[in-house]
Amino acid sequence: MDSGCWLFGGEFEDSVFEERPERRSGPPASYCAKLCEPQWFYEETESSDDVEVLTLKKFKGDLAYRRQEYQKALQEYSSISEKLSSTNFAMKRDVQEGQARCLAHLGRHMEALEIAANLENKATNTDHLTTVLYLQLAICSSLQNLEKTIFCLQKLISLHPFNPWNWGKLAEAYLNLGPALSAALASSQKQHSFTSSDKTIKSFFPHSGKDCLLCFPETLPESSLFSVEANSSNSQKNEKALTNIQNCMAEKRETVLIETQLKACASFIRTRLLLQFTQPQQTSFALERNLRTQQEIEDKMKGFSFKEDTLLLIAEVMGEDIPEKIKDEVHPEVKCVGSVALTALVTVSSEEFEDKWFRKIKDHFCPFENQFHTEIQILA
């Protein structure tokens, strides 16, 4: 054939002309799997591979943690951390998480939270951040700090808004928070009595930090401070003013309890809605857990004593985004966006989270929040 007519790519591979290997007759060779004895990693190893040696030490730490020997596990993890290469990111994350969990079990919560905060700052994808947030949740739960526990759950939900189990945990946390805040208000009222030594009547609201879930002023507005005159003509007036403020405080305690119950109820309803949407996709034990949880929620909802139209409105608000988005969340995508952009996906405060999810409900059912400050100014 003329070389000028030869088509590029028209040549044959040499393998076309090669003979195929003959098949061996008889049964195939048996597969011999490597069997490891229990606790095989405790045996002496003469491996020159540093990574393998550190991996064996990690297995020892994991077993000690499993046995609840947290001090021993912490020692193993710490010895690995000192020798681990700075480029071995995967094992470094695992080891640091192990250290944090051991420290939490040993009562060293602040050290555990420092490690968790460091891991959060270095997270580069949603999987890493999710793991760190669950770690923080475990530490705060061990610390029995309700507000921090709730904030951890809020951050998890902002990252995975269609996870029903985190919404359920948030609802339970709100249920526990309500009585705690109400009791704190009552206790503060008893401890901080009104005094006239500085000729002012001081507020007995508890101190509210920047990240408090329900913020109360440390003192009443300037206009609400009542001057206490020494003469008896103003005594009756001052007593009446004190009584009015105490009544307002009692109403405030009741409002705090109702607000937290409303948030708990809304979170339970959101949980139930998400479970109902995922129910057709589930079978076996997953479906059993789903149905059992829905029944438990139904039983707890009876204790709220909210009217049916109230529950319907809450369900409407908490389910606004579900029909369009739930299908996209069945197989969530792992987003690798870098630590800075990843931070933007997570809520920065409880106020921001609650404003997003509960503002419509609160405005409809809790008008007392704005009314309270108005009443105080009128009394002044």
Swiss-Prot record:
<dbReference type="InterPro" id="IPR041404">
    <property type="entry name" value="DUF5588"/>
</dbReference>
<dbReference type="InterPro" id="IPR011990">
    <property type="entry name" value="TPR-like_helical_dom_sf"/>
</dbReference>
<protein>
    <recommendedName>
        <fullName>Uncharacterized protein C8orf76</fullName>
    </recommendedName>
</protein>
<dbReference type="Pfam" id="PF17826">
    <property type="entry name" value="DUF5588"/>
</dbReference>
